[in-house]
Structure formats: structure tokens, C-alpha cells
């Protein structure tokens, strides 16, 4: 993957008939869904059939499995996934016919035009924060549109056109494509080194976030505990934007304090800039999720809603798919799935799991352990962050590591998941590149009271249900 050349979005009513190449992914299917709901004629293709494709077909899309030039049909606009190669026959056909070709983010940007757009950006926490904002606004009586990188657990949907002026979207910095969005409000959760296959270094990432801030028209909501996000806040102030901060720091406009944990429920207080403190009960573990929640309250307040009512919506938040998602329980072992694929994300989820187990033990429960099944994502990320991955995974009691999920990359000589396993600071580590062997290993070490976490951005997510079944 490489950085995407920014393309200015086109108003939805000027797109004409739209064809999606690579329509089966979460991001592309979400945009297609919203366009269908807004009355746009949509067709699309993907290499493999999927439930998402069938859902779009039921909404009225013309769906093709496999790629062929004739699938483009009489489209006026073609939207292309970043996973599509230049040699794709549909893309070749679209270019030969001089059709309007948009990257995914430009199509997403079209959905924001003329609406109160809220875009959530940052290295970590985007999907959960976008989901929280959506659920909070729904609780407050709004009917926002939304396009999220994961599905809401309560509805099973990751996108909807909505019925009022607000739309909440997840802004992807990985390839620079968030520079095609022009939101009224932006959230910056944090800024760290990641996607270094695209960016030369952290400074280049900061430059891209600074450019993104230049596309925001009104307000920037920033996680003030993070040094990288604080730098972005300074850029926003210099450009005359309204800046609101959230975090545990005393200087935060929406200050999080008095965090307590009861199993997988987290209680805390938020001090807003005006008015009384608001008390929140969040049915999710993790200090990082209290910060995501504070961002959601700040956005709701910015739009004009009462923070005290907003936190009631957080109490109803059931989470987003693959974000510490409960997959099942068998023989006293609880299995969860996590999209964490960066060392910071892994450490945050393992800290959350440990806090939940400790709170249960403090009430006289069994002192359970953490068993992780981790799948490294990308050869480049494994090579760059091997030490950091090992340090984060040391927080688990038992660590089973799969082979690297290559995704878009070709193998690199000498780069395997063993770069991580050989650096983990205890001996309860098992390298199992074979999926069946990995599941068997997890089941053999798990004990009643333990938490099993499948972690990674690849197909490790498929193994959670298998582990539950095998444990039973």
C-alpha cells in the first residue's frame, strides 16, 4: 500500500450511477449502503462472495462476484478500494472510458458535503470512539448517519444514511486518505508511529495530521494525554479553530477522573468545562475506553447536547465488533476478540483484561489468567515493532503466536513471528504458525477463570468461535 493522492469529493447528487470495485470490505460496503439509502443506483464487485455483498444486493445493488470489464456497465462514477491493483479489468475499463474514478475516501467525503460531519482520526481508538459518538447521539434522539470501520454490536451494521444533518465517520490516516474529508468537527484520539510502510517517520505522520486539521471548519476535539495529539491541538489553535481537550490531565476541558473497575464494567467521572460533573458507567473494560467515552461526550456537547444526558447513552454502549468483543464462554473460560495490531493497542487491551480479572479476584473470585492468541499483521510492522510487540505481550500469562498475516505485503527474508516470540520476557510462549495447532495449544493451556483474547487485524478473528467450541 502507498499514500493515496488526495481527490476532492463530488456531491452525491452529481455522482450518477456508481460502481464499486472491491465492494465487500467494511469501508466500501458501508459507503455503498449509504448511497443506496440515499437513492443512488449502485453496482459493485468483489473477488469473493460475502454476507455484506448479499445485504447490499437486498438493498438494491447489482452485485458481481469476481472482476470483469463488463461489470462496470453504464456507471458514471467508479469507486476503487485501496486493495485493487492497477491491472484490475474493471479499473482498466473505467480508465479506458474516461469515467470519474474516486478512491474510497473521496466517496466517503461526498457523504459529508452539506452535513454536520464529525470525523474521528487517530492511531488508536477510532472505531470505538466513532461507535460511541453514534450511540450517544442516537440516545439523545438524533438520527445521525454513520460510517464506521467495524459493526455496532447492537445492530450488526457499520453504516447508515441517517435522517438528520449529522454524520459521523471514521477517518483513515493509514494511507493519507483522510485528506479527502472536510468535517465540521474532528476528533484526534492520539498520534503515534504506525503505517511506516507508507510514512518515512513520525514527523511525516504529524505533517499529514496537520494537513487534515486544515480541512476542519469549526472544532477539533483532542486527547490531551497523548503528546502527538497535543501537537495537533497547537496546529489547530494556530489556524484559529476551536480546540477542546479531553483526558486525565488536570488541564483537560473534559477531565476524566475517579476511574474504578468492577469486572468488565468501568465507572468514572467527567468534569465538563461548564456545569456539574457527570458520572458514567461504561460496560467495557479499560482506561483507554474512558478516554474514548470522554471524546464522545465532548462531541455531543459541542453539537449542543447536555453532557449529563449524553453519558446515559454510554451506559447502553454494547461495543463494536472486534473491539474486545465477547465471543463465548465454555468450561469457565471467557473468549474475546480484539482488533489490536499495534503494541500500544495490545498493551491497552491486556491492561484492561488484567484490571477486570483483578477486580473479580478482589471480590473473592478465582484469580484468572490472560491467554493470548496473537497474529502479527504485516511483515513490515513485525520487523519494525518486534521489540515493542514482545514487551506488550509480556503482560499476558500465556502467549500463543501465529504466523504473520501478510495482507498486502510480500514476505521479507528473515522476518517471521519468531522475531517476537524470542523476545518475550517469560517462557510461557508458543510459536504455532499452523491455525489448528494454535487453537489446540490455546485450549491445552486455558483454565477455568481465564480470559482468552484472540488479537490481530487478520483472520485470527475466525478462531475465537473455534476455541469456544473446542473448550466445550
UniProtKB/Swiss-Prot annotation:
According to UniProt, this protein's pathway is:
Cell wall biogenesis; peptidoglycan biosynthesis
Q: What Enzyme Commission number does this protein have?
A: 6.3.2.8
Catalytic reaction list: UDP-N-acetyl-alpha-D-muramate + L-alanine + ATP = UDP-N-acetyl-alpha-D-muramoyl-L-alanine + ADP + phosphate + H(+)
Q: Which InterPro entries match?
A: Mur-like_cat_sf, Mur_ligase_C, Mur_ligase_C_dom_sf, Mur_ligase_cen, Mur_ligase_N, MurCDEF_pg_biosynth, UDP-N-AcMur_Ala_ligase_MurC
Q: What class of enzyme is it?
A: ligase
Source organism, top-level taxon? Bacteria
Answer whether the UniProt record assigns the keyword ATP-binding to this protein.
yes
Predominant place of localization: cytoplasm
Q: Which family does it belong to?
A: Belongs to the MurCDEF family.
Q: What protein is this chain from? A: UDP-N-acetylmuramate--L-alanine ligase
* Name of the gene this protein is made from: murC
